[in-house]
Amino acid sequence: MTKLCTVTLVLLLALYCRAEERPAAVTPQQVDEIVDHLLSGLGDYVFPEVAEKLQSQIRAHRSEYRAISDSNALAARLTEDLRAVGRDHHLTVSFGEELGVQKEPTSAEKQHAHAFDLADGHGIRSARRLPGNIGYVDLAYFSPDSDAGTALAAAMQLVSGTDALIVDLRRNGGGSGETATALLSYFFEEVTQLSSIVERKNGQPLERQKWTMPYVAGPRYVGKPVFILVSLRTHSAAELCAYDLKNTHRATIVGERSGGDANSSTGGEIALGYGFSAMIPNGQTRSPITHGNWQGTGVEPDVATTASDALVAAYKLALTDAKPSVESEGLTKERQLALQDPQAALAEEITGFQKK
C-alpha cells in the first residue's frame, strides 16, 4: 500500500477507532517541543518561499501557544495560523489522531477499515442507467481499500452500454490518488501522461510522472461523451480527475468552481509528539498541458451552474450529445420524454443531492 493510501486508511480508521488515550492538557515545555517539531517539518513545505513565511508566523506566536494548555485548542490555533499564511486547506495540525504516524495499522485495524469501507460501498454511492441510456456514477470519495478497483470495475461494467456518462464528484473530498488514477484510466484508449508530482524531500525537489494505467479491470469508456459534476465541496483527488479530463478534452466539466486543493502530502503525517501530528503538503501537481494546477483557484467548469442544478444541466447535454448505440421505438420515446422533462427523469438524484 502506498503512503497516500496508508494516510487515507488512517482517516477511515479514525471514523470508528478511538485513538490511544492521551492527556488533554499540555505544558509550556511540551508546547515548545511540539512547535519545534512543526517548524522543522515546515521546511519541506512545497513552496520554499511560503515555507519561510509559515515558519515566521509560528515563531511570532510562540509565546501565545505556550499559554494554551488545552490540546485541541492548541491544534486548532496552529492550524488557523498556518492556513492564514499558506492559504492551503491541507495544512493541518491534529491532536489525538496520530494513529499510524509512527507505525502501520495493525491487522485488526485494517480488517475494521476494510469492513467499514465495504459497508460504505467503497465510496460508490450510485451506479445506474438513467432514462435515455445515460450512465450515472456517484463517487463520494476515492477508496484506498484493496477491493476499490474491483468495485469501480463493477460500476463501469454496469454503465458500459450507455451512450454517455455522468460522473458525480460534487460531494467528493478526495482520497486515494491510485483509485482516482484508476477511474481516469477508463476514459483513455492509450496510456497517457496526466500530470507530474513535484515534491520536496529534505529541501530538494523531486519529480514523478503520473500516467494512466495500461490495464483496468472493467471495460474502458472511450469514444463516448463524459460529463464530470463538480462543486465547491469537490477537493483534492476529485479535482485532479476533473482537471485532467478537462485539459485533455476528454470530458465536459459542469457545476461550480471546485475547492482549490492541489497540494499533497506524499510523506503522510508528521509526528509532533504528545499526541500531535501535522499534515504538511510537500508536493504539488503539475499538468503537462497547462504547466500549472488548480491550487487556490479550483477547477473552472466548462458549463457553470449551481451545484444543485449541475446534474440537470449535464443530463440535458448528455441526451443531446449522445449517439444512440441501439435504435428502437422505446428508446427513442424514452430520450424524447427525458429531454422534455429532465427534472422528472432525475427526481431521485436531484432530491438526494439537495437533502445532503
State where each predicted segment sits.
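Low-complexity, Gly/Ser/Thr/Pro-rich intrinsically disordered linker/tail segments
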Residues: 292-356
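STAS-typified acidic loop motif
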Residues: 124-149
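Terminal peptide-recognition signature
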Residues: 38, 82, 137, 167, ...
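Bacterial N-terminal signal peptides
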Residues: 5-14
